[in-house]
Amino acid sequence: MTRVKICGITETIHALAAVEAGADLIGLVFAPSKRLVDVELAKEIVTSVKGQKELNKRAEQEIIAVGVFVNTPAAEVNRVAEYCNLDRVQLSGDEPWDYLRAIERPTIKAVRVRRHQRSEDVLAELAPGEQRQGSDLIYLLDCHIAGSYGGSGQAFDWKVAQDAAERFPVIIAGGLCTENVGEVIRIAGPWGVDVSSGIESEGIKDISKIKAFIAAVRHTDQELRKQSYEKNPVTG
């Protein structure tokens, strides 16, 4: 199953709608951005989401609250993560791999893919992370845009992520929307997909777009399972 991360949440109502629609991860941005949230609001959102999960015992998925940071001192990342009860932290800046050793929560490390970069180059860039944090590390691949640390709405060549997705848990971000998320899943087979601007209307999260995006992911997963079964039917 492809995990869905709804990033850039700034309102509790949108977080709850995402969870209700079947999101696996929600992202809260603690870096300079139009989607920046303060720690009090973030804590409120996380508490509401986890409270909803407790009330809805039928919900099978684990909801993972992710805090997104950019070049923030490790001590501050750990403080915010503890205060807001985050499950993971996403490092979307220029943090060196050794920095990960100082982070107390499981990590998602963003790596920006440059134009014309080859798949072997991407693999080489990700390999040191496994040595620093082991198999618990998740990688997020996003499009490299000069002066930007994500949320640009620009896509990269998904074919270069194929090899990485076979070896590591990889989330693909950048330019995703309801219309193209099925294609990236078919091409790269990632652990997860990340969306922010692709589910917004006039810069604000749109609940109908959130639902449509998640539905598109689940539909693609179902189609791929069906195709796999038809090629290799279970016998006996």
How would you label these PLM feature ranges?
Residues 1-236:
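Conserved N-terminal beta1-alpha1 strand-loop-helix module at the mouth
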